[in-house]
Amino acid sequence: MEKAIEIRECTALDELAECVQIQREVFALPEAELSPVRHFVVTKNAGGFVIGAYDGDRLAGFVLSVPAFLRGERAFYSHMTGVRQEYQSYGIGAKLKWAQRTRALDDGVKYIKWTFEPVKAKNAYFNLEKLGAIVCEYQPNFYGTDYATADNKIGLASDRLFAEWHLESSKVNALAAGEKYIETGEPTAAIEIMSDWLSMVKSNPAEALEEQKRIRSEFEAAFGDGLIGRGFRRDAERPAFLLYQNNDVHF
């Protein structure tokens, strides 16, 4: 049964404090790495915003948007999106992102950017196929190597892809309207990733380290050739990012 979720901005201090608590529950981060209430307050007063998903009075999830620039224009940096575990099968993450888009467009902003882990297929599919974001930048070890994080005892680098959400692209407009978007051309290249990254990290850490290096190398080569990732192939065995020539992108 679908929950009756209300999407609205978080403005009160107790609401922002609940965003900090959701970070504790959702992200495998040390306490010192959590964004505190004052970070949310400063962001809001600097022109950013926090959108929350409410199940009655209970905050089920949130998305934090920080003022930024992209391609020489005003943008928002989507610093984090968190949804409590018991609400993660209700499409709340998507509701938050589409509300974020609406809010940005109301502010006259056409771009939102954020980072995500290139090794996680579920996130990649959501970002590129459900939201219509593109990727054209890879940052090795973006946050540094943190051996203290719960799922990173082997010392994996914090590699990240930068997602660019062009809020009025033909693909994003179609997806926002609930329509299916079909690419007109064939991808120039594909970069395969593993179907279950966390299982590989636990069962074969050495292989996980080598896979991360391979994926990094392939993305750096593809972006160096001017390719842009704007699709993702879901496959139980061989999921893959789909990369196209830059001039095929519909901004």
Question: Which residues does each PLM region occupy?
Answer:
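Charged catalytic carboxylate motif
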Residues: 18, 123, 214
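A conserved beta-turn-beta hairpin within the catalytic core of GNAT-like acetyltransferases
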Residues: 68-78, 88, 110, 186-191
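A conserved beta-strand-loop-helix scaffold within acyl/acetyltransferase catalytic domains
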Residues: 5-85, 230-235, 245-247
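Intrinsically disordered, low-complexity, positively biased terminal segments
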Residues: 1, 107-109, 126-131, 135-251
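Short, structured patches in soluble enzyme cores that scaffold and shape functional sites
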Residues: 82, 116, 165-167
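Conserved acetyl-CoA pyrophosphate-binding loop and the N-cap/start of the following alpha-helix
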Residues: 87, 91-99
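Conserved GNAT acetyl-CoA-binding A-motif
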Residues: 104-117
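Residue-level recognition of the GNAT/N-acetyltransferase active site
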Residues: 84-86, 117, 194
